[in-house]
Design a protein with these regions (language model features):
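A compositional/biophysical signature of low hydrophobicity enriched in polar/charged and small residues
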Residues: 1-167
Length: 167
């Protein structure tokens, strides 16, 4: 789906004010409530907006140790490795990649000892041939999407004549 300027404006407002209601969102965006409702439904239906939930600080929740783990997978075993990774609570996310490894995982642990147990559990799985890990010291750029959306190609909004562009 190609996003237009109104879509991006709504996503920016939702990111800046995650608990905002539709009425306030429409006021800040300068469009009718029905327009906001329709746009939000379209963004959800197309998979652009995948959910609304809290952003959890893992360190504050008791998981201050994070690492990125690169896995080399045995030929033809990606599906079963994927199932194994999904079953491990310490694995936050995993991506199939190019390069020297096949899968890149982000894991969270309570301590270095806990991290070591997670790594041992990964290495014990038959479909994983080798793993290498790097421990996160600090986050220098947190997960974000708005810079990509606001600096990417966008077309003008298709909107009702009452819409006033804030520019």
């Amino acid at each position: 789906m190609e996003l237009d300027t109104l879509d991006v404006a709504l996503l920016r407002l939702l990111t800046e004010h995650p608990r905002i209601g539709v009425l306030e969102l429409s006021r800040l965006a300068g469009v009718a409530r029905a327009t906001v409702t329709a746009r939000m439904e379209r963004l959800r239906a197309s998979g652009v907006v995948t959910g609304y939930g809290p952003q959890v600080d893992l360190a504050a929740a008791g998981y201050p140790v994070q690492a990125f783990v690169t896995l080399e997978i045995a030929q033809g075993r990606l599906d079963e490795v994927t199932e194994h990774l999904a079953a491990l609570p310490g694995v936050l996310e995993a991506y199939a990649t190019t390069g020297p490894g096949d899968v890149l995982c982000r894991v969270a642990a309570r301590s270095n000892d806990d991290l070591q147990q997670i790594l041992l559990e990964l290495d014990r799985f038959a479909g994983i041939r080798r793993s290498t890990s790097v421990v996160v010291l600090s986050t220098v750029v947190a997960h974000r999407t708005l810079p990509r959306l606001t600096h990417g190609p966008q077309r003008g909004a298709h909107h009702a004549p009452s819409y006033r562009d804030p520019a």
